[in-house]
From Swiss-Prot:
Residues 423-432 have a biased composition (Low complexity). Detected in eye lens (at protein level). Eye lens. One of its GO terms (molecular function) is gap junction channel activity. Residues 353-365, 375-405 have a biased composition (Basic and acidic residues). A hemichannel or connexon is composed of a hexamer of connexins. A functional gap junction is formed by the apposition of two hemichannels. Forms heteromeric channels with GJA3. GO terms for cellular component: connexin complex; plasma membrane. It holds the Pfam family Connexin50. Keywords: Cell junction, Cell membrane, Disulfide bond, Gap junction, Membrane, Transmembrane, Transmembrane helix. This is Gap junction alpha-8 protein. GO terms for biological process: cell-cell signaling; gap junction-mediated intercellular transport. Residues 13-21, 93-161, 232-440 are cytoplasmic.
Amino acid sequence: MGDWSFLGNILEEVNEHSTVIGRVWLTVLFIFRILILGTAAEFVWGDEQSDFVCNTQQPGCENVCYDEAFPISHIRLWVLQIIFVSTPSLVYVGHAVHHVRMEEKRKEREAEELSQQSPGNGGERAPLAADQGSVKKSSSSSKGTKKFRLEGTLLRTYVCHIIFKTLFEVGFIVGHYFLYGFRILPLYRCSRWPCPNVVDCFVSRPTEKTIFILFMLSVASVSLFLNILEMSHLGLKKIRSAFKRPVEQPLGEIPEKSLHSIAVSSIQKAKGYQLLEEEKIVSHYFPLTEVGMVEASPLSAKPFSQFEEKVGPGPLGDLSRAYQETLPSYAQVGAQEGVEEEQPIEAAAEPEVGDKSQEAERVSTEGEETLAVLEEEKVEPPEVEKEAEKEETPPEKVSKQELTPEKAPSLCAELPGEDTRPLSRLSKASSRARSDDLTV
């Protein structure tokens, strides 16, 4: 037979661009078809027509009977089968090589565009060129280790070539059955013209030829099974990837990026605008003032336990004493109201807490004397009272009293027996009057 090296070199390219099952199919094709067909089958069918003998002397009858028994030689049929089955693989290899060349050209074009966009970076061009050269060298020198992914149009072409291989395998198996059947009989009877009657013809090596036919049909069946298995493998792989894509895509394709906070100083501030920042919550402590304190001085923040100690309940005797010291009598309240009507309260004249307690005690001791003073005021001469008032009242109070002279007679008309002056003044006036009586 002829040289099969050319077809073998082409089919080696298919091995690089096919799946595992496709490589097994190529192994079956090379070893069990081409190798056996080239070594053993030629010797078995070498004397096919010369050994076909018929029991007639009619010229042409033997040739006509051989043509009817074997319309095409088995060897030539199997060669055609190998060629037709390998043709889709050759088409696929051509498309794969074209795809690889286009990818290489696209990468070279992108590299040139990158080099043109950065003309100043001369130092960076050298390692890029070295990497590209290494990639080209590895793809050209180490062909066996090169990985190729089946996707897109390349995958569709691969599936189509498997379908055509399957169709050709089925077609040749069916054709072989209709032409020869699956066995060769040693006796063949022929009645074609120009044979005078039914002629008996005898086939050489029928058992050996039957074994070869069965072997080749079994190899064709294995190739057909591998094609179907490869189709199912690709289909299941595609379905599995379609089911896994919506689950794995968001986890794998989301890039991990550090999110900048609002208050980062690296953000450029626009003119007239300020970055939004959260205000820090400042805790203020407002301590409770102690009982009896008029003004609470600002205190620094202290632990809560100290405030609990200050605010904690004390003995009942202390509280009653504090209330006695701070609560004024009815007479003091009336005196304060009279002073508020006559003049505003002066801040500088407010007594301290200790003076208030002393004055409250003094007022309580002198409460009895005020009743006697009120009775003696009717007998005392008015000049003494006026002098005492002039000595005690400052000029500001005198001017304010002169501005409101109408209030005194009205109050006297309503309450003729009572005096509206404060008790402190009355006590001082009474003591002054008593001293004057003694001197007189």
